[in-house]
Amino acid sequence: MSAKDSMAKEYFADNARFADLCNNILYGGREVILPENLKERDTTEVLTALGLNKKTIAMQKLRDIFKNASIKYTGKSYVVLIGVENQSDIHYAIPVKNMFYDVMAYGNQVKETAKKHRREKDTATSDEFLSGFTKEDKLIPVITITVYLGTKEWDGPRRLSDMFGDVDEELLPFIPDYRINLLAPREITDFTGFRTSIRQLFEVLQNAYDKEKMQEVLQNDENFSKVDRETVEAINLFAGTDIDIDEKEEVIDMCKAWEEQKNEGRELGREEGREEGREEGRISQAKVTALKLQKKGHSIEDIAECVEFDEETVKKWLVS
């Protein structure tokens, strides 16, 4: 597992950030899904099926994050399963990948329900017995959210049909489609709905390609004056920044850190310029001295030792 994969899983597994992410994608920023109403689920999806030789085939996929969400909204209570798939790079087959996760999650629900009925022997008809599922049984809806953590614009498919070639239009109504739920930083137009520091992460990712815009965001958004350590670490990793983090600090003033970094860069540039100037002066003086010594009849070896440069360099000076 790469450093980016590990960081993304740990970062968004936090219930407060997970809820914030889901509320912005699913409810337009309204605080409907609460952190305390989220429960971890096993991220391993395992589904078995019979192969052509009647042997059981087991398929296994590992999700990034998968949680059970209990939602109370509009006077009603709901339960939904929400998975988050993090992408640091564009995935050009993401609809198939996510659809497979969802199908396996539904398949597991049917499998567990069938086990329960076999154990309790409570199916009423042969159809229900063969299905392992009764007319009264219900599935828990599954939602998968794709979080793109790159700085480029997303140019990958957004639905299964985007991956098709030419298709007879008369057939389209009979072909099930699948749409991904994508969060891409470059496409966010309003950050005010975010309540956690994922806002700062997405704002930086949106502007990472333009240093002037990045500077403007950091100077004008006071939210960057207090950013938690984990978010700054995520920003450094995904946006490619190099914000200094004091080991003793849990909250970082990114505005100040960014300005200090710029100043250090300017000072380093000036120092390098001074060093370069000093070196050029030393070489120029050495050339003058070498020519004088040559006129006096000194050997190349003696001249090189005197000006403290190698003999090959001195030879080039004297023949040019």
Where are these regions (language model features)?
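Elongated, amphipathic alpha-helical interaction scaffolds
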Residues: 1-320
